[in-house]
Amino acid sequence: MTTERTGILLLVSGPSGSGKTTLCRRLADEDEAIYSTSCTTRPSRKGERDGHDYHFLTRETFEQKVTNGEFLEYAEVHGNLYGTLKTEVLDHLAKGIDVVMDIDVQGAAQVRSCADTSIKAALVDVFVMPHTEDELLKRLT
């Protein structure tokens, strides 16, 4: 009897400068997990690729996806919308692929409150903090 493994959703949150992005990128670089690709309405920056760094959407398209309930989490930051599509995460999990999300505390709360049973069953929640307040201040300056 073979049991198919379902992926894990590793939700990594913490304050800016805590090291969460470094942790997530390292996991993805070592092929331990897929780094989730967020959607955004901000313009792409030099060197960024659509579908790799972000899914670049118009505000209208993004807002329609919000209305349709397509986001696992989303927020507006500095006038731009950012969010993670449910289908992208669920598709990877169903294939047994682990997904890592680098997310702020508010976004993590949205993911935790998701009603989808597949998301809830796969969720591993990690909060990252630097060792000391001095270390956090050093990272932010």
How should each PLM-predicted stretch be described?
Residues 28-37:
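Post-Walker A helix-loop "phosphate-sensing" segment adjacent to the P-loop in P-loop NTPases
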Residues 1-9:
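Extreme N-terminal, non-catalytic leader segments
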Residues 21:
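Walker A/P-loop
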Residues 99-105, 118-140:
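Conserved phosphate-donor/acceptor-positioning beta-strand/loop module used by diverse small-molecule
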Residues 38-99, 105-106:
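ATP-dependent small-molecule kinase phosphotransfer cores
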Residues 24-25:
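The feature captures the helix immediately C-terminal to the Walker
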Residues 18:
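ATP-binding Walker
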Residues 13-15:
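P-loop (Walker A) phosphate-binding loop of NTP-binding proteins
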